[in-house]
Regions:
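Extended low-complexity intrinsically disordered regions
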Residues: 1-65
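Residue-level signal for alpha-helical context at structural boundaries
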Residues: 30, 72, 104, 122-123
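An amphipathic alpha-helical micro-motif enriched in hydrophobic residues
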Residues: 47-58, 73-105
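Acidic/His metal-coordination segments adjacent to aromatic residues that form catalytic metal sites
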Residues: 64-72
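A short structural micro-motif
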Residues: 111-114
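Conserved small/polar residues in nucleotide/adenosyl-binding loops
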Residues: 125-127
Length: 127
């Protein structure tokens, strides 16, 4: 199969939002979100940080699984450190959304109860 990369990039550009391609449009969109009450600065920090730090965590696992890096205390500690970095950005997201971390976990438990109706998560929640 032959792909015309010029047509492909034209298509990508055609379906990409103006705020993804143009600084003024992006600034306008950020202003709109700010006026709507979004803590967009902190939310953006959280989104990019969670993705980046999650990638660092995944990189360590990838090297252990596919590149022969050993499972040892150093790598375990490195994973814990990276997981802590992920949690730092999760805290940023909680602040951006004005939601306590406990409420996020409670919401996840409720979602899991619906997904796995045979399971019991009540012991996880202290009332």
């Amino acid at each position: 199969m032959s792909i015309d990369f010029d047509k492909y990039t034209e298509f990508v550009d055609a379906v990409t939002s103006d705020s993804s391609k143009d600084f003024v449009s992006l600034a306008d969109r950020l202003g709109d979100l700010d006026r709507q009450g979004a803590n967009i600065e902190r939310l953006t920090t959280a989104a990019i940080g969670i993705a980046a730090e999650g990638g660092e965590f995944a990189e360590i696992v990838k090297k252990m699984v596919f590149q022969g890096k050993p499972w040892n205390e150093d790598n375990r500690e490195h994973l814990i450190i990276e997981l802590g970095d992920v949690m730092w950005y999760v805290a940023q997201a909680c602040m951006a959304l004005d939601v306590p971390f406990d409420d996020v976990i409670r919401g996840n438990v409720k979602k899991l109860e619906k997904r796995y109706p045979g399971g019991s998560f009540l012991s996880l929640i202290h009332i």
